[in-house]
């Protein structure tokens, strides 16, 4: 179970590793959760701290379920690495790498959107987010979120397209993802290897970040100095806290941690 992080001290052995990297989710970790997903943004103070870490030589990589375009726009940080679409797309040193096997999934997502259009019309607040080969169905703004969730799952079960995807739930969203063995865990390990990291701190707030925490924990058994940190909200699941070494309270806690890291690095 995650211990509440109140000091930078437990992380110092990890921070002393070279190269050292910060692997972080974006929504709910760096950027506050907002009612409309398109309005999300990393606060400028947080961006400034991340830029400061990059200047200190920290290899920052952001791992998100968003599309690459959306992730880069929300973060506003051109000089860091990205793993978008839960790792389906990597962006490192200005080069984009797309996971093989995604052919046809964008068309399937459009079909799923069409199947869900009646639901969007009938339940105010349901919103579809087309991420290319992935589809997110948001229901945070609905009047009765649990009722909306059940209706979305029922519609997805009726849609013949759904069987071509993994269905995964997150914070007031349900997502369709290509079943090709890529997640935030595989993305984290790819980034550790590509960036040559000897030490890493991983941050996340949602169920999809459990894959990242688990992968980092396994890598630690093979010599990576690492710490995993759950960013806690009222929506955090017990499984997230069980998977992490430490916990912080919301995006303000993350901002505090980034400042402490910057000071510790001198």
Each language-model region and where it sits:
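Mg2+-dependent phosphoryl-transfer enzymes with acidic/Ser/Thr/Gly-rich catalytic loops
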Residues: 3-5, 17, 178, 185-266
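The start of beta-strands in P-loop NTPase/AAA+ ATPase cores
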Residues: 20-22, 80, 200
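Anion (oxyanion) recognition and catalysis
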Residues: 54-55, 161, 222, 241
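Conserved acidic, metal-coordinating active-site core of Asp-based
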Residues: 115, 123, 129-215, 224
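Active-site phosphate-binding/coordination module
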Residues: 41-131
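Non-catalytic pre-domain segments flanking phosphatase-related domains
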Residues: 1-26, 30-34, 38, 45, ...
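Glycine-rich phosphate-binding "P-loop"
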Residues: 31-40, 171-179
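Structural recognition of alpha->loop->beta junctions
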Residues: 76-90, 158-159, 240-255
């Amino acid at each position: 179970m995650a211990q509440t992080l109140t000091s930078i001290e437990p992380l110092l052995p990890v921070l002393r590793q070279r190269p050292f990297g910060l692997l972080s989710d974006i929504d709910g970790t760096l950027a506050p959760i907002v009612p409309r997903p398109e309005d999300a943004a990393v606060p400028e103070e947080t961006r400034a701290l991340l830029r400061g870490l990059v200047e200190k030589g920290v290899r920052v990589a952001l791992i998100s379920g968003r599309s690459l375009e959306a992730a880069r726009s929300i973060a506003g940080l051109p000089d860091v690495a990205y793993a978008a679409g839960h790792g389906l797309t990597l962006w490192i040193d200005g080069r984009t790498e797309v996971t093989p096997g995604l052919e046809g999934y964008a068309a399937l997502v459009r079909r799923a959107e069409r199947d869900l259009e009646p639901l969007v019309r009938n339940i105010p607040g349901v919103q579809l987010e087309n991420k290319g080969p992935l589809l997110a169905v948001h229901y945070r703004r609905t009047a009765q979120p649990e009722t909306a969730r059940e209706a979305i799952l029922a519609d997805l079960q009726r849609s013949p397209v759904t069987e071509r995807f993994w269905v995964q739930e997150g914070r007031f969203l349900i997502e369709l993802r290509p079943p090709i063995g890529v997640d935030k865990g595989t993305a984290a390990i790819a980034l550790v290897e590509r960036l040559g990291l000897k030490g890493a701190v991983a941050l996340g707030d949602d169920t999809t970040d459990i894959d990242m925490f688990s992968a980092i924990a396994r890598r630690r058994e093979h010599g990576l100095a690492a710490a995993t940190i759950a960013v806690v909200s009222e929506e955090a699941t017990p499984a997230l806290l069980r998977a992490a070494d430490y916990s912080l309270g919301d995006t303000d806690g993350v901002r505090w941690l980034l400042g402490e890291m910057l000071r510790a690095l001198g």
